[in-house]
Amino acid sequence: MNKKTESKEQKRSFRSAIVLAGGRGRRMGMVEKALLEFERKTILERLLENLFRVVDEVILSVRDNSQKEKLFPVLDKFPDREIRFCFDSLEDAGPLEGIRAGLLESRSENSFVCAGDMPFVNPEIVDLLFEKASGHDAAIPRWEERMFEPLHAVYSKKMLPEIEKAFERGKHSVLAPVFQMQDVVFVEVSEIREFDPELRTFVNINTVEDLENMIGHAKEKVGL
């Protein structure tokens, strides 16, 4: 670690990450996507390794105790890291409920949020989003077509009352409370490409084909 990096880490505040692992993997036969293996590591293990390069705690947002028990063995690989679980209070409320539960559990003002099936989350991008979010309500990647990456973003606890209001209106989209917050920073994907040209940080695994493509891409990289 060079002196510049060390100085930067000493100055930064405590950071949390919320991993939304509560999805049922319906498009993959109801499997726990976070436990799928890729290059001898589960997706969750790979994700945690990347996150702990830039955060101090990780909160795993899960459906219930049954899912917690399935994921728990992965935590044995991180004995010196702070990893906790939180649970949805509302059924079938989607990822927005996972974000709400995670923000309530988080020890920091700002938390990075991502899905549990994203094996290539880039620590440099996470670091960038935390920096952009500092002093603001949120920092969210934005594409040129005005599409967003709300499940790869940093949110402050100021989002909590807006989530409650969204639920009261019957809205479960993650963007519903986002657009009600007053001070959201949108980070252009063109800026993110400077750190991650292929934008692999946004890759998630929804189908068997996604997993096969990911494995095929890795083989091409090593010339197999």
UniProtKB/Swiss-Prot annotation:
Pfam families hit by this protein: NTP_transf_3
Required cofactor(s): Mg(2+)
Superkingdom as given in the UniProt entry: Archaea
Keywords: Cytoplasm, GTP-binding, Magnesium, Metal-binding, Molybdenum cofactor biosynthesis, Nucleotide-binding, Transferase
Alphabetized GO MF terms: GTP binding; metal ion binding; molybdenum cofactor guanylyltransferase activity
Binding site residues for GTP: L20, A21, G22, K33, D88, D117
Biological processes, Gene Ontology terms: Mo-molybdopterin cofactor biosynthetic process
Membrane-crossing segments per the record: none
One GO CC term on file: cytoplasm
Catalyzed reactions: Mo-molybdopterin + GTP + H(+) = Mo-molybdopterin guanine dinucleotide + diphosphate
Localization per Swiss-Prot or TrEMBL: Cytoplasm
EC number assigned by the record: 2.7.7.77
Positions contributing to Mg(2+) binding: D117
Enzyme class label: transferase
Signal peptide stretch: none
Principal cellular location given in the protein's record: cytoplasm
Purpose of the protein: Transfers a GMP moiety from GTP to Mo-molybdopterin (Mo-MPT) cofactor (Moco or molybdenum cofactor) to form Mo-molybdopterin guanine dinucleotide (Mo-MGD) cofactor.
Domain-related comment: The N-terminal domain determines nucleotide recognition and specific binding, while the C-terminal domain determines the specific binding to the target protein.
Family as reported in the entry's similarity comment: Belongs to the MobA family.
Protein's UniProt name: Probable molybdenum cofactor guanylyltransferase
Species assigned in the record: Methanosarcina mazei (strain ATCC BAA-159 / DSM 3647 / Goe1 / Go1 / JCM 11833 / OCM 88) (Methanosarcina frisia)
